[in-house]
A protein has these predicted regions:
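Short, active-site-adjacent cap segments at secondary-structure transitions
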Residues: 3, 116-118, 153-155
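Core dinuclear metal-dependent hydrolase active-site scaffold
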Residues: 1-56, 156-159
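Residues at the C-termini of beta-strands that transition into short coil/loop
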Residues: 14-16, 60, 149-151
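Cap/insert and terminal regions of metallo-dependent hydrolase folds
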Residues: 45-146
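Cofactor-binding loop segments of dinucleotide-utilizing enzymes, especially the Rossmann-like FAD-
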Residues: 39, 113, 150
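Short, basic/aromatic-enriched C-terminal tail that caps enzymatic domains
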Residues: 143-159
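A generic structural signal for short, non-catalytic loop/turn and secondary-structure boundary residues
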Residues: 3-5, 138-140, 150
Length: 159
């Protein structure tokens, strides 16, 4: 249920992952809204609704599917990562951006990028290509992409 941290309204929402009650979060304060969803095996319509009308998004771009398939993980781990209860791939995020993204968010943070099964540049290029292929090319550059990192802070936005 909804809770507050000072004036910040936080709305948890259910995501698909193989954990006990996994959630993403939607944040609202003074007319600014954002959402964060990592550890998501799929980006379904229910999650897409929580991401709508946000000024910024932080979404998982965990892996390149081919890198997982040829990588060193045991088969059962590969199957888990690639499943709808695993992690969101670059391609799955790109599909969301091309087909379900409402284009309100001006900033998209690519998050939870696997060191073993992804490359930040591949994740970035996949998302950028999806935005550029959108049917409304004038909007392609209206959403700025940002990489997040496991060992250092990301940029801070002044919204």
């Amino acid at each position: 249920s909804v809770f507050f941290i000072g004036d910040l309204q936080v709305t948890p929402f259910t995501v698909s992952h193989d954990a006990a009650e996994p959630v993403g979060f939607r944040f609202s304060n003074n007319g600014i809204c954002g959402a964060l969803a990592t550890d998501i095996g799929e980006l379904n319509n229910t999650i897409a609704k929580q991401l709508a009308d946000c000024d910024w998004l932080g979404l998982e771009s965990n892996h390149d599917e081919e890198m997982v398939k040829i990588g060193p993980y045991p088969l059962h781990v590969k199957q888990r990562v690639l499943s709808s209860k695993g992690h969101l791939s670059n391609q799955e995020l790109a599909d969301f951006l091309a087909n379900k993204f409402d284009r309100k968010a001006k900033h998209l943070f690519l998050a939870h990028i696997s060191r073993q099964n992804n490359d930040p540049q591949i994740a970035l290029e996949s998302a950028q290509k999806a935005l550029e292929e959108e049917k409304l090319p004038l909007l392609a550059n209206s959403c700025k992409l940002h990489l997040t990192h496991q060992t250092k802070p990301s940029i801070v936005l002044d919204l």
